[in-house]
Amino acid sequence: MRDLKIPEQRHPEKAHRPDNAQPKKPSWIRVKAPGGKGYAETHKIMRENNLVTVCEEAGCPNVGECWSQGHATMMIMGEICTRGCTFCNIATGRPDTLDAFEPGRVAHAVQKLGLNHVVITSVDRDDLEDGGADHFAQTIRAVRHRSPQTTIEILTPDFLKCAPEVLETVVEAKPDVFNHNLETVPGLYPEVRPGARYFHSLRLLQRVKELDPSIFTKSGIMVGLGEQAPQVKQVMDDMRAADVDFLTIGQYLQPTPKHHAVDRFVTPEEFESYEKAAYGKGFLMVSATPLTRSSYHAGDDFAKLRAARNAKLGLA
């Protein structure tokens, strides 16, 4: 039995990699330690429903703030991923079989937490013929049935090894926001995201809009991996060409010495510059700060996103 709390067992595919020193974080990266009544209650509900969260599995720096407010990003289809991205702290290996009761448990937890907005993500499941598309759809429908007032945001894998039709299965379940992260600039894909294809991910986002223009599309990248500013701005252009509505940009933080090294810590002023550039390119919503993550403040951001589209359409 693997102990996923031990890095060597959590990431066996990274054992051959040399150790990379983990640099000291600058003052603008510091966060408070998790704790408090709200945090404990969120933790309790997750455990009672036997649910996995990306907040814990990926070591998100914002877990204390989000959980104290009763917000958690639920990760479906297990805690073991079939990919081995060099930036990611999710365990890699052979996943367990799908849990048919998981969609219902997610819906129960959403209701129990009283969420106005929920973010649901997953590991990559290249072992499944549909990549887990039907499981995503079932989870969306279960939440809709139990909490019809809750808006639903999904953060999906790329379905790279699946038939193109599987994307329709997810879109037909009508999430409010479809998020798929490009993660980094295309030049870094061979090292950072070797199991993925940049232009496939772009096309997936574009296809969502073609299938259902009412669904908001969202994507994000990390900076501090070794990219240059012109490359980041080219990614912005590529996303806008794919009609992506919402862009997130955050600082890459190295989970362990075996992971991709932090090239540098991008300053808050540089993030402000990226945000300004992105709005200038036509994104409806941009979140670009050192601690920005895909689901950070997602509920508040969704309200702003919807207001921005209404204003653009003259409905405000």
Swiss-Prot record:
It catalyses: [[Fe-S] cluster scaffold protein carrying a second [4Fe-4S](2+) cluster] + N(6)-octanoyl-L-lysyl-[protein] + 2 oxidized [2Fe-2S]-[ferredoxin] + 2 S-adenosyl-L-methionine + 4 H(+) = [[Fe-S] cluster scaffold protein] + N(6)-[(R)-dihydrolipoyl]-L-lysyl-[protein] + 4 Fe(3+) + 2 hydrogen sulfide + 2 5'-deoxyadenosine + 2 L-methionine + 2 reduced [2Fe-2S]-[ferredoxin]. It is found in: Cytoplasm. It holds the Pfam family Radical_SAM. Binds 2 [4Fe-4S] clusters per subunit. One cluster is coordinated with 3 cysteines and an exchangeable S-adenosyl-L-methionine. [4Fe-4S] cluster 1 binds at C55, C60, C66, S295. Its EC number is 2.8.1.8. Its cofactor is [4Fe-4S] cluster. Pathway: Protein modification; protein lipoylation via endogenous pathway; protein N(6)-(lipoyl)lysine from octanoyl-[acyl-carrier-protein]: step 2/2. Residues 1-19 have a biased composition (Basic and acidic residues). It is an enzyme of class 2 (transferase). Residues 67-284 form the Radical SAM core domain. [4Fe-4S] cluster 2 binds at C81, C85, C88. GO terms for cellular component: cytoplasm. GO terms for molecular function: 4 iron, 4 sulfur cluster binding; lipoate synthase activity; metal ion binding. Residues 1-31 are annotated as: Disordered. InterPro entries: Aldolase_TIM, Elp3/MiaA/NifB-like_rSAM, LIAS_N, Lipoyl_synth, rSAM. Keywords: 4Fe-4S, Cytoplasm, Iron, Iron-sulfur, Metal-binding, S-adenosyl-L-methionine, Transferase. Belongs to the radical SAM superfamily. Lipoyl synthase family. This is Lipoyl synthase. It comes from Ruegeria sp. (strain TM1040) (Silicibacter sp.).
